Design a protein with these regions (language model features):
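A cross-family phosphate/adenosyl-ligand binding-site feature
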Residues: 1-234
Length: 234
């Protein structure tokens, strides 16, 4: 049975033992995709940040907290998968330093002109999908070559949707990218558009996340079938 990897939910980047940076991702789309993939006959492993939603019983779930932990788990699991869907919303930045004790007002830099403002130094976290994209096995017509892997990313954009999404697709070496908007965050419905590497819109899907997930899995299967037909070894 072919196995796919799904990243899901937010991540947390702690400032101290109490406070952390995060976002409003609920993990609902990841859970819906996991169920849809199981229904389609895939074996499913989910790498999930902290969420309240329940994943389907048939899926293996690997719980993580930080972006670094999510990347490590995904990189370990991806080699045994035929593809991966990046439905998670990992934090893009982490604090430069994590305090061992709850921070006080004097623990961050204040300038004389700050008027009570704190300066929080952040560093970029690793890009999980780009890391997977850099290691994925490409599809090949060579019958002796290992089977290829596919990669599908999500892109939440508020402007220049196509341009920004395609830039992400290319930078992360993905095969498809799913463009959604902020209204889907922490909601039960979603409005998405699937783009391929040429910028062509393969589908526009709206509705309950359960239904959207089923359509997404079907579109991915159709894409992979077409790619496989062009590469008989996979």
């Amino acid at each position: 049975m072919a196995k796919i990897l799904i990243t899901s939910g937010p991540t947390r980047q702690y400032l101290d033992p109490i406070r952390y940076l995060t976002n409003a991702s609920s993990g609902r789309m990841g859970a819906a995709l996991a169920q849809a993939a199981l229904d389609a006959g895939f074996e499913v492993v989910v790498v999930s940040g902290p969420v309240d939603v329940k994943y389907p019983n048939g899926a293996r779930v690997v719980d993580v907290v930080s972006t670094e932990e999510m990347r490590t788990a995904a990189m370990q699991l991806f080699p045994e998968c035929v593809g991966a869907i990046g439905a998670a919303a990992p934090c893009d930045y982490r604090p430069d330093a994590v305090l061992t004790d709850k921070m006080s007002k004097n623990d961050f830099i204040r300038s004389p002109e700050a008027n009570g403002e704190l300066l929080l130094r952040l560093r970029e976290t690793p890009d999980i999908m780009a890391s997977l994209g850099a290691t994925k096995r490409e599809f090949s017509p060579d019958p002796t070559a290992p089977s290829g892997q596919w990669l599908v990313a999500f892109a939440l954009e508020t402007s220049d949707h196509h341009v920004r999404a395609l830039q992400k697709l290319q930078r992360k070496h993905c095969d498809l990218i799913v463009v959604n908007d902020p209204t889907s965050i922490n909601g039960t419905t979603s409005n998405v558009e699937i783009l391929d590497a040429t910028g062509e819109t393969l589908a526009q899907i709206s509705g309950d996340k359960t239904d959207v997930a089923r359509r997404l899995i079907a579109e991915i299967q159709a894409f992979v079938a077409k790619r496989t037909a062009a590469s008989p070894s996979v």
